[in-house]
Amino acid sequence: MTTVHSIADPCDPEVSPTNNRHLTVSYASRYPDYTRIPALTMKGQWLEAAGFATGTEVDVRVMNGCIVLTAQQPQPEESELMQSLRQVSKLSARKQKQVQAFIDVMAGSK
């Protein structure tokens, strides 16, 4: 017989049944041989309410029998100066020195 201490306490589910959605795996065909590829389609206002507005980037984690979709937080806008710095860092060492010399002249340090 089970003791009182080994009976599981009832708990609320993390997701309410009203938030559950049911999908059916359909297919998309691929040209030129029209091979059937498994496909899922999700649409509805509930996506935006759940944090998946149009244009939101999504991380997808796949496990056996489980797919987890996570909305990525929007990245803050990078300043024009940081964008320029990123471009300069891709240049050759010689061109980077030329850019540094130009900056020094403009700043009046040399």
UniProtKB/Swiss-Prot annotation:
Residues 29-74 form the SpoVT-AbrB domain. It is found in: Cytoplasm. One of its GO terms (biological process) is RNA metabolic process. Transmembrane segments: none annotated. The keyword Ribosomal protein does not apply. Its EC number is 3.1.-.-. GO terms for molecular function: DNA binding; RNA binding; RNA endonuclease activity. Keywords: Cytoplasm, DNA-binding, Endonuclease, Hydrolase, Nuclease, RNA-binding. GO terms for cellular component: cytoplasm. It comes from the Bacteria. The keyword RNA-binding applies. InterPro entries: SpoVT-AbrB_dom (IPR007159), Toxin_SymE-like (IPR014944), TypeI_TA_SymE (IPR020883). Involved in the degradation and recycling of damaged RNA. It is itself a target for degradation by the ATP-dependent protease Lon. Belongs to the SymE family. This is Endoribonuclease SymE. It comes from Salmonella typhimurium (strain LT2 / SGSC1412 / ATCC 700720). The lineage of its organism: Bacteria, Pseudomonadati, Pseudomonadota, Gammaproteobacteria, Enterobacterales.
